[in-house]
Regions:
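Non-catalytic terminal extensions of PLP-dependent enzymes
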Residues: 1-170
Length: 170
């Protein structure tokens, strides 16, 4: 029951920013909410995968991506999810949407969302992006308290899908 309460809390908090798929007649969702990002490619030239990668800069593992609907995020808060953590996730999604809007308004293809995730080596190394290191690594104040840096930067998902290497041990 608490998973349903948590999913509906998050869905209501994000309702002004994101459309939710599969809500009932009362506007409520089940134990999960599916956020519609289908228009992001057209509106911001940013896709669902870019947003999933940017979530890593905020310290979150991406939720289920493009299932059951292409270009969506399926968020399933657990029964024991603390409200403070849900609030951080909500603030993160809203901030990432703002970053998408800024990128579209500036017309800048080299932006903080499409280049995510940003590793510690990248933040500390030579910087060639038009946005600041601060924006890349610490976009919201709560991140300063316990920053987690991803170990790898953006990878070519399509290449990985087409060139699977299976290694079996004996």
């Amino acid at each position: 029951e608490m998973a349903i309460v948590n999913a509906n809390y998050m869905s209501a908090a994000l309702a002004s920013e994101f459309r939710t798929y599969y809500s009932g007649e009362t506007g409520r969702v089940g134990h999960e909410m599916i956020l519609d990002l289908t228009h992001f490619k057209k509106d911001y030239n940013i896709d669902c995968g870019d947003i999933a990668h940017r979530l890593m800069d905020y310290g979150f593992h991406a939720p289920t991506l493009s299932f059951p609907v292409h270009e969506t995020l399926m968020v399933e808060p657990t029964e024991s999810e603390p409200k403070a953590e849900m609030d951080r996730f909500i603030a993160t999604l809203i901030q990432i949407k703002r970053e998408c809007e800024e990128a579209a308004a500036s017309g800048e293809a080299d932006n903080v969302v499409v280049n995510a995730p940003h590793t510690a080596a990248e933040i500390c190394g030579e910087w060639s992006h038009p946005y600041t290191r601060e924006k890349a690594a610490f976009p919201l104040e709560f991140i300063r308290e316990s920053k987690f840096f991803p170990y790898v930067s953006k990878i070519d998902n399509g290449y990985g899908d087409r060139n699977l290497v299976c290694r079996c041990t004996e």
